[in-house]
């Protein structure tokens, strides 16, 4: 699909062979009751074609961005990458408005030549603030416990990253092939739906906060997005596909754009 077929960030993403299509379809359908509007995304980031691999055997690469906003959600965006056997990626993040006491929603679903790396969380804006975390965690932990029992553990979280994840961070590494495909369909997909539905329930219930509270939440959101932009694990892959200038503009101007948008 060429860029000119997607004139808006809300236009459907349809990339041949992209394995995470059902997840984006579920998310976009779940968001419709919130009356989403297109989020402004520059044309170069709506959909971009490239290649990887050798000159003798180039592999086509497509990267697309689906995005929207609502009255309570500043930015909802999904970065979609399909590069054949090299990579297939869904990176879906919901950034709430600081006028509402909400966490982030995050889903990283990554297929690489050595396996699937899969992560889901409702990530806290301020992990040290029980008024922010406890109403979420008491509803999220039962979902985590249900699905975590079905999956191998993904390994430890680096200490510097721990402030940005909840105790219900669902994180796994699973193999390619039939075993991985079965776990994705039986566990990861329903877990994604459960986490997202809880998040959207929280959004529906959220009431505006005071100006002082909004300032505190905005500060926490900026810390989170600055950390994510600095440590984005896709930086190396995207740089190989499209070069450093495009990649840095994408990371700072689209994926984690709060500093520019605030």
Curated annotation (Swiss-Prot):
One of its GO terms (molecular function) is cobalt ion binding. The keyword Oxidoreductase applies. It is an enzyme of class 1 (oxidoreductase). Gene3D superfamilies: 3.40.1500.20. Keywords: Oxidoreductase. It catalyses: (3Z)-phycoerythrobilin + oxidized 2[4Fe-4S]-[ferredoxin] = 15,16-dihydrobiliverdin + reduced 2[4Fe-4S]-[ferredoxin] + 2 H(+). It comes from the Bacteria. The keyword Mitochondrion does not apply. GO terms for biological process: phytochromobilin biosynthetic process. InterPro entries: Ferredoxin-dep_bilin_Rdtase, Phycoerythrobilin_Fdx_Rdtase. Its EC number is 1.3.7.3. Belongs to the HY2 family. Catalyzes the two-electron reduction of the C2 and C3(1) diene system of 15,16-dihydrobiliverdin. This is Phycoerythrobilin:ferredoxin oxidoreductase. It comes from Parasynechococcus marenigrum (strain WH8102). The lineage of its organism: Bacteria, Bacillati, Cyanobacteriota, Cyanophyceae, Synechococcales.
């Amino acid at each position: 699909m060429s860029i000119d077929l997607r004139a808006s960030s809300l236009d459907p993403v349809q990339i041949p062979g992209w394995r995470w299509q059902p997840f984006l379809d579920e998310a976009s359908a779940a968001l419709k009751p919130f009356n989403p509007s297109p989020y402004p995304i520059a044309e170069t980031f709506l959909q971009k074609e490239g290649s990887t691999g050798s000159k003798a055997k180039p592999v086509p690469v497509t990267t697309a961005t689906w995005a929207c906003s609502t009255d309570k959600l500043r930015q909802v965006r999904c970065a979609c990458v399909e590069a054949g056997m090299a990579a297939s990626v869904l990176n879906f993040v919901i950034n709430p408005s600081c006028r509402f006491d909400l966490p982030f929603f995050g889903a990283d679903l990554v297929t690489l030549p050595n396996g699937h790396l899969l992560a889901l969380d409702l990530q806290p804006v301020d992990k040290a603030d029980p008024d922010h975390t406890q109403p979420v965690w008491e509803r999220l932990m039962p979902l985590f416990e249900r699905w975590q029992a079905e999956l191998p553990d993904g390994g430890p979280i680096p200490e510097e990253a721990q402030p940005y994840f909840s105790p219900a961070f669902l994180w796994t590494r699973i193999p390619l092939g039939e075993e991985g495909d079965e776990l994705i369909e039986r566990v990861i997909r329903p877990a994604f739906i459960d986490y997202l539905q809880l998040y959207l329930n929280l959004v529906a219930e959220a009431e505006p906060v005071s100006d002082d509270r909004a300032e505190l939440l905005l500060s926490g959101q900026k810390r989170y997005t600055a950390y994510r932009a600095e440590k984005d694990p896709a930086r190396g892959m995207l740089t190989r596909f499209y070069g450093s200038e495009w990649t840095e503009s994408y990371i700072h101007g689209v994926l984690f754009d709060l500093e520019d948008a605030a």
